[in-house]
Amino acid sequence: MSATKCWTEMVRAEHAQSDNMRREEPPADSWSNFAQNFRADPRRTDDVLVDYLRKEIAPGQVILDVGAGGGRLALPLALDAEKMIAVEPSPSMCQVLREVADEFDVQNVDVVESGWLEAQVSRVDVAICAHVLYVIQDIEAFVRKLEEHAGQVMVIMYQGPPQSQIYPLWELVHGVPRLPLPSLPEFLEVLGQLRVEPNVEVVHAQRNRGFESLEIAREQLARRLYVTPDSPQMERLEGLLRQVLEEKDGGFTIKGGIHLEPRVVSWRPSG
């Protein structure tokens, strides 16, 4: 099986398993209840990924952020750019991005409310795409369009699936192993198939403090595991919490959880 087909099958299998566990249809905008959590000061000085990207991207360039979310990367990078084009399909995320841009007077950002494969944008100097690809089924078309629209491509992703820390809980709660999404290892295989030789840099980030309380842990884990109140799965989850969580530095984290750190995968498309 080719690397691109393997990628697509992993995404489809994970999505099918998720759909099978859901008790209700997902909302049209899956970020509507959480978009406000992605607000961030564009001029913050404690974000190692932002600092890394600002050093790597020369000032005065036109930048494209594909899957820009609430602007956590797009707005800080816009401060040094000639122009920032932020492509984002979620209406609630676009609203947050526009609000934060207005609040902090960042005026050189064009928001394109669209999926990437449908978006119509001009060619830019640099395209960035952070923590988006894990769920993209047509990975080849997605990457090729990035290459067609940028002199340099910078993809940010973890060395493992973003939710991999809770995969062991999935089996304990549901009785079956969690089917993983693809991440960095599979992406490098895809790039190899596409004859791309990227540079890969690790951005060392501090561990997340975790959940603020056991109650917040229960609520968030239940949502991520598609567990509903008063169900046998919720009963199992509640019984497991004190076994699988440890209190550390004022928060609760999953014991033995992998420390996910972003990798910046960059290359200059040929031609």
PLM region spans:
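Short alpha-helix
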Residues: 180-195
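Conserved Class I S-adenosyl-L-methionine
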Residues: 199-271
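A short glycine-rich, Lys/Arg-flanked "PGG" loop and its adjoining helix->strand segment in the class I
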Residues: 140-154
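A short SAM/SAH-binding and catalytic strip from SAM-dependent methyltransferases
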Residues: 126-138
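Conserved class I S-adenosyl-L-methionine
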Residues: 1-57, 61-69, 152-179
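Class I SAM-dependent methyltransferase SAM/SAH-binding core
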Residues: 70-117
